[in-house]
């Protein structure tokens, strides 16, 4: 785990509220893997903001983070430019390592999609992906997923992009009971509960990355600890 200021190499606005930063942080990138996150200090705010790591480039010493503006802290982040520095603590969290010996299905919902991009890339070109969004205007990273996975299914609540419905509507038709597959998912808690329940019903292994408000990011304050 490291805590220092790292330079932003590039920024991209993905939609009206979502931004992507590529950050130069060689030692942090070297210690990162799928499902981990960083805690970013936002100006004069006391508490850091937890942001998932979307992509990791160990060779070039960079990570990509994708975040949605939800308050003053992330609004401050969205106003940063290439060349600015961010005070970052990380990498944090347990994460996971995709099992390449089994069929890999990666499911992202909303702002839970970015960490699944890095996971699908790590798994390889046989990755299968299901993405869920509220509407077409909320969709992000769809082209990037299509460039790394052999199959990408998209759902929206209102049917403006892909199939109308939820990610579980697609998943239940993609997998057979007890097949040699692993599902990896990140997104809103109701979505994760539905995905986990379906995987349990079909006797398929499932990993979920949980979203939670937190303060320290290392488990000491217990804000991010969930009972299960």
Feature roles, as predicted:
Residues 1, 214:
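Residues that recognize and position ribonucleotide moieties
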Residues 18, 32-34, 98-100, 219-220:
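Short glycine/proline-enriched turns and hinge-like loops at secondary-structure junctions
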Residues 72-213:
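FNR/FR-type flavoprotein reductase catalytic core
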Residues 216, 221-224:
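Short cysteine clusters
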Residues 228:
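Conserved small/polar residues in nucleotide/adenosyl-binding loops
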């Amino acid at each position: 785990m490291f805590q220092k200021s790292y330079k932003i190499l590039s920024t991209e606005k993905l939609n009206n509220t979502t931004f992507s930063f590529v950050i130069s942080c060689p030692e942090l990138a070297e210690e990162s893997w799928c499902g981990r996150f960083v805690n970013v200090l936002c100006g004069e705010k006391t508490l850091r903001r937890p942001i998932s790591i979307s992509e990791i480039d160990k060779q070039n010493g960079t990570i990509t983070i994708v975040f949605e503006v939800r308050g003053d802290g992330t609004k401050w982040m969205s106003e940063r430019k290439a060349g600015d520095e961010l005070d970052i603590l990380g990498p944090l969290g347990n994460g996971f390592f995709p099992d390449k010996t089994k069929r890999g299905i990666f499911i992202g919902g909303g702002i839970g999609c970015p960490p699944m991009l890095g996971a699908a890339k790590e798994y390889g070109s046989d990755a299968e992906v299901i993405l869920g969004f509220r509407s077409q205007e909320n969709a992000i990273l769809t082209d990037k997923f299509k460039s790394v996975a052999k199959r990408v299914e998209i759902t929206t609540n209102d049917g403006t992009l892909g199939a109308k419905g939820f990610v579980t509507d697609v998943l239940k038709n993609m997998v057979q009971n007890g097949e040699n597959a692993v599902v990896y998912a990140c997104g809103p808690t109701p979505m994760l509960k539905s995905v986990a329940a379906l995987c349990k019903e079909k006797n398929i292994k499932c990993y979920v990355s949980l979203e939670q408000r937190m303060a320290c990011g290392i488990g000491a304050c217990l804000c991010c600890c969930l009972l299960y």
